[in-house]
A protein has these predicted regions:
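Short acidic, glycine/serine/threonine-rich loops at helix termini
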Residues: 1-6, 40-44, 61-64, 80-81, ...
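Glycine/aspartate-rich loop-and-adjacent alpha/beta segment that forms the canonical ThDP
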Residues: 40, 268-303
Length: 303
């Protein structure tokens, strides 16, 4: 769904508290192909839910549906479009949608007052700054990890098949192979793979395939020296984080050892300049982004 549509309010479940409130005020919720396994916060509401899907959805974690329409999704939607009369959207609802979207982008995804640029780039800024200048048809793949939750809200997609993420099992190491496939399938569109340092270390060997096939795309390696998705939960519970923290690794040297150009950045200006340069090079390029990983925990809807 295009993120610049006035009806778009954001993605439910990740860094989207205002959306929770809007859903509770709805007359009816219609879900289309919704896989509820990845919804982080339990959804409990008295609002009727109509599910349109090719499978039975009552075995999911979202909430038992009031009415399910099971079958060919596109056929069901075509039928409804042709048989339901045109309705004007409430101006009040449009205003609420805009407020919800703005609150997520400006507040929940905003940089905290404790952030210091000298500590690295705020992770939410990575997606926001790159989105400002890359073409609308840019395709991204988001790996598993804390940054994936950010990608769901901070990266604005405008076209179908331009945002790829592995839900459910969320395998680390997904993004590079997915990005290579996306670029082969859509050679005219810029393609960017986003991966955390943990995910990168799990599949660094795929760099050899990338180099051998010489696929012109960009890899963004988001470095905070931790498995933050798990580490954040350990911190909240007072657990030891030794197993989810690790020392700084020379990622630039690893990438270059495969014969791939690498750019390392620690400031937003460097990130913007480096990404623009990588787009112009039109060849395999990795950008190592040194983050202030503490920002993940400072955001209102922390991971």
């Amino acid at each position: 769904y295009p993120c610049d549509d006035p009806l778009y309010i954001g993605m439910y479940g990740w860094f989207g508290t205002p959306i929770d409130e809007m859903l509770k005020k709805a007359d009816t919720i219609i879900t289309i192909g919704l896989d509820g396994w990845d919804i982080i916060r339990p959804f409990k509401s008295q609002v009727p839910i109509i599910s349109i899907d090719s499978v039975d959805v009552n075995d999911r974690t979202f909430q038992p549906v009031t009415q399910g329409l099971r079958g060919d999704i596109s056929g069901i939607l075509d039928f409804l479009e042709n048989n339901i009369g045109q309705r004007n959207t409430s101006t009040e609802w449009l205003s609420l949608a805009k407020q919800s979207f703005n609150k997520i982008q400006d507040y929940e995804l905003g940089v905290s007052t404790d952030y210091n640029p000298s500590d690295g780039i705020a992770p939410q800024s990575v997606y926001k700054e790159i989105r400002k200048f890359v073409p609308k048809d840019t395709i991204i793949t988001a790996d598993a990890g804390a940054h994936k939750s950010l990608a769901s809200q901070a990266w604005l997609s405008y076209l179908p098949l331009s945002y790829f993420v592995s839900n459910g099992l969320s395998p680390m190491g997904f993004s590079l192979g997915a990005a290579m496939g996306a670029k082969i399938a859509s050679p005219e569109s810029p393609v960017i793979s986003f991966v955390g340092d943990g995910g990168f270390l799990m599949y660094a060997g795929e760099l050899a395939t990338w180099k051998r096939l010489n696929i012109p795309m960009i890899q963004i390696i988001m470095v905070d020296n931790a498995l933050t998705q798990v580490k954040s939960k350990q911190l909240k519970r007072g657990y030891n984080t030794e197993s989810t923290s690790f020392d700084k690794v020379e990622y630039k040297r690893i990438v270059e050892s495969f014969g791939i150009e690498a750019i390392e950045v620690s400031k937003v200006t460097e990130l913007v300049e480096g990404t623009k340069r990588a787009l112009q090079l039109n060849k395999p390029v990795s950008i190592i982004v040194n983050l202030d990983g503490s920002e993940y925990l400072r955001m209102p809807s922390a991971v």
